[in-house]
From Swiss-Prot, chain B:
It comes from Neurospora crassa (strain ATCC 24698 / 74-OR23-1A / CBS 708.71 / DSM 1257 / FGSC 987). GO terms for biological process: maturation of LSU-rRNA; maturation of SSU-rRNA; positive regulation of rRNA processing; rRNA (guanine-N7)-methylation; tRNA methylation; tRNA wobble uridine modification. This is Multifunctional methyltransferase subunit trm112. GO terms for molecular function: protein heterodimerization activity; protein methyltransferase activity; rRNA (guanine) methyltransferase activity; tRNA (guanine(10)-N2)-methyltransferase activity; tRNA methyltransferase activator activity. Belongs to the TRM112 family.
Length: 457, 127
């Protein structure tokens, strides 16, 4: 060790001194308090969406009133931002628990990219959602970021789970609860994830450690906007951005997002971007070459409860949908989408539902709490618009539940046509290393263009 | 928020990126905790050259730890010295900033850290 004496036992002492006492009591206590200070995972899974403003880091997101910016939005950039806030950010905040419960299986191409990274590499996952890509490669350190504080709260749960010292007990309980398939769990399968972009027909529903994993993994997560990232430029070895950029509503912003990713990685570092494809001939969504590329895609939070709680009264349908051209294809696309979604939703949701995050004590009316409790100012604009646009579709796939109880959220998507992603990489002063198509998605691995002289700045 | 992560973060404000004052961010009113994480020697040894050591020294000092040596340990040091490896692990991976603020030394903007998660969303006038 010689001259290199790091803060040793004294460091631990200092930590202990400064730390909240309860956080140090035990591993379990530490993990619990670190991931969701106020309480159990149950509370987190349901409470984040419900009480966003009360849930720590969630405040800033929901605190931005969606009605403010549109009224003052005079420049296109601000307008695009406001649009995305209403039709992407707020939606994810609202559907975070359900969304998270359906997202656990990595896309193969992404997993392959991650596994190709060297031990000790430092990577970024921009738009990490619930953090399903954290821990795929256990020998890299990854920092995930997402615009949605509620999703980041889920990702943080995952981080804590992944880094726990080996304890079979908790995991075994989860598995048992899952296999048991209690009634309670069945009642959880209310979500109908209509967007298939982060698909997951996963046989393995364990969100925490992957099956067979025995290495503890260190990762981290934070809340950030993809266009204003807090990462020091040129420091990361690699970055991924999966099913994120298609949520940006202008081409300029999509290209800028790729530019930001490239700036984060060192020279030679690689960035993988994955977006929903326009060409989905194999899927039942009905989208294909030549179709409309800018769409609002519904996410239906279904309730199968006989007596759902009332949804909060919409404050107003103040957020009139702009850009009407983006909805022109709804009639033709949504029915198929809804059907697809239902099938996918049932398949996906059944094994996992919220059981992973809250194995036993989910309130019966969880879905409605989530659907309606996110804060009217936040979700109603999207929801109201959704009702107007997708109401009939929602009914078609409800059948076994009260249609009126379903909460429909619209998410904006830009469907990439063949070649467009590569064009955007070039426009972002990047170079395409490789690219491909995987189950309704285009992907690209990009790096800095060799003549990019802005790397130094 | 791990100390490790802090070593890769700067201010989210565009104008601050080019300023040396924006890195590292300065912890303020930090409440720390220590996670119990299994050590991954291979990862640590390979991560070491990716660490900005000077920034780590600053962060470490600001968090109240004893001053780090001026020079980082070498991979060989780490490989041969288990105690050193463990110390590095404790500092980088296990030490968590649970609550507090991260302050940009350039623009002065403060980012909140709550429940161990830092929030870098900017108010509209800073975007």
């Amino acid at each position: 060790m010689g001259a290199h004496s790091l803060p040793s036992a004294s460091a631990a002492d200092a930590v202990a001194k400064l730390a909240a006492a309860e956080a140090l009591k035990s591993t379990a206590a530490s993990a619990a308090s670190a991931s969701s200070a106020p309480g159990s995972s149950t509370e987190t899974a349901l409470g984040t969406a419900q009480g966003a403003s009360a849930a720590g880091g969630a405040g800033p997101v929901t605190a931005v009133p969606s009605s403010d910016t549109p009224s003052v939005a005079v420049d296109p950039e601000a307008e695009a931002e406001a649009y995305e806030r209403a039709n992407v950010h707020n939606v994810y905040e609202a559907i975070a628990p359900h969304f998270s419960a359906t997202r656990y299986k990595p896309w193969p191409a992404v997993a392959q990219f991650l596994h190709a990274q060297q031990p000790g590499y430092v990577g970024l996952d921009v738009g990490c959602g619930n953090g399903k890509y954290l821990g795929v490669n256990k020998n890299v350190f990854m920092v995930g970021s997402d615009r949605s504080a509620n999703l980041v709260a889920h990702a943080n749960e995952r981080v804590k789970e992944l880094q726990k010292p080996q304890q079979q007990q908790p995991e075994a309980e989860v598995v048992r609860a899952r296999i048991g398939g209690s009634k309670k769990e069945k009642k959880q399968k209310q979500e109908v994830p209509t967007g298939g972009e982060r698909e997951s027909e996963a046989p393995n529903a364990v969100i925490g450690k992957e099956t067979g994993s025995e290495v503890a993994v260190a990762n981290d997560v934070l809340v950030a906007d993809g266009l204003s990232l807090p990462f020091r430029e040129g420091r990361a070895d690699f970055a991924i951005c999966i099913a994120v950029i298609h949520h940006m509503s202008t081409r300029t912003r999509r290209q800028e997002a790729i530019r930001q990713l490239l700036k984060c990685v060192r020279p030679g570092g690689q960035v993988m971007v994955y977006v929903w494809a326009l060409e989905q001939g194999e899927s039942r969504r009905g989208w294909d070459e030549g179709g409309e590329q800018d769409l609002l895609v519904p996410w239906v939070l279904k309730s199968q409860q006989p007596k759902p709680k009332k949804e909060k009264q919409p404050k107003a349908s103040k957020q009139k949908q702009k850009w009407p051209q983006q909805q022109q294809n709804h009639d033709s696309t949504e029915p198929q989408e809804a059907i697809t979604a239902k099938n996918v939703g049932e398949k996906e949701a059944t094994p996992t539902s919220s059981s992973i995050l809250s194995p036993s004590s989910v309130p019966k009316d969880a879905s409605m709490t989530i659907g309606g409790g996110t804060g009217a100012g936040v979700t109603e604009p999207a929801s109201a618009a959704a009702a107007a646009v997708a109401g009939p579709d929602a009914k078609t796939d409800t059948g076994d539940a009260a249609a009126s109880a379903d909460a429909v959220f619209q998410r904006y998507y830009h469907l990439y046509r063949n070649g467009e992603l590569e064009e955007d990489v070039l426009a972002a002063r990047g170079a395409v290393v490789m690219s491909g198509y995987e189950r309704d998605n285009w992907w690209v691995v990009a790096t800095h263009a060799t003549n990019d002289d802005t790397l130094q700045d | 928020m791990k100390v490790m992560t802090l070593n890769f973060l700067t201010c989210a404000v565009k104008n601050c990126k080019s300023s040396n004052d924006s890195f590292p961010l300065h912890p303020k009113e930090a409440e720390l905790a220590k996670d119990d994480i299994e050590i991954n020697p291979q990862l640590l040894i390979n991560v070491l050259p990716r660490i900005d050591w000077a920034a780590l020294r600053t962060t470490s000092t600001e968090l109240g730890f004893p001053t780090l040596p001026e020079q980082p340990p070498s991979p060989e040091d780490l490989q041969s010295d288990e105690a050193l490896l463990k110390e590095l692990h404790e500092l980088l991976m296990e030490t968590q900033m649970m609550e507090g603020k991260l302050v940009c030394g350039h623009c002065g903007h403060e980012y909140a850290v709550k429940n161990g998660v830092a929030n870098f969303l900017l108010p509209s006038h800073l975007v």
